[in-house]
Amino acid sequence: MAEHRFEDFNGLVMYRKNYKEKDMLVKILTDRFGKKMFYLRGANKPKFRLSAAILPFTQAEYGGDIRDDGLSFLNNVKSATQFQTISQDLFLNAYATYILNLIDVGFPDSEPLGIWYDKVEQALNLIDEGFDAAMITHIIEIQLLQVFGVQPQLQGCAVCGRTDLAFDYSESYGGLLCQRHWHLDPNRFHSSQRAIYYLRLFSVIDLFKIQSVNVKEATQVELKMIIDRLYQDTVGLSLKSKQFIDKMYSFDSQLPQLKKVPSEIDSTPKDD
């Protein structure tokens, strides 16, 4: 018989789905127990008492019956707040969903995530406050590569370790090559130094110390191409939320009514 205990915990609603006629399954990223699926009987009934606490993109202090195996159960909520900006903006919604999907795929259920719970919470806070959703998502993507077991060498040259020369990315060498060793891989990415700079920066930047971000559009486009290629070739993920972002990215100019007002993100380092 599975062990269970009544616990208080903080959590972020990852997603929810209807179950049977009037019930619901809600997956919550918790600060203490990792990702847990909760069964809420009667959640689809009118005036369900926990309705506000199980909305998408909600963070709350919960109390519940935590089961080691199988479904857990929510009993009460002490406080709940929703990421309002994310909830009301299709673009931000897509990026936040993608971040949560990456976490769902990257970590087993019922295992504490440690610092990653705080990272995800802070990433959503930054996006909700108006920081560039694509750049915050790229930071998460790059730092998650280690979780997926494919962390590239981004601190120095993968061959000689030098850190003071121009760099390019090499899939064959699993990281950066300094200019002296570019000849070793004719299929290197041929990336700009500005894009490589941000790739390296995003791999170590502390989300809690970001005050602003300002990356030129051309660099953003190149960064997206680099990170997409890393995920396609080394991680091998094909998430629906990422496909949706790519479609938005491609057809952004055709959807002016959905475009977000440019965010106020000046950068922690400036992109001169």
From Swiss-Prot:
GO terms for biological process: DNA recombination; double-strand break repair. Keywords: DNA damage, DNA recombination, DNA repair. It holds the Pfam family RecO_C. It comes from the Bacteria. One of its GO terms (cellular component) is bacterial nucleoid. The keyword DNA repair applies. Involved in DNA repair and RecF pathway recombination. Belongs to the RecO family. This is DNA repair protein RecO. The lineage of its organism: Bacteria, Bacillati, Bacillota, Bacilli, Lactobacillales.
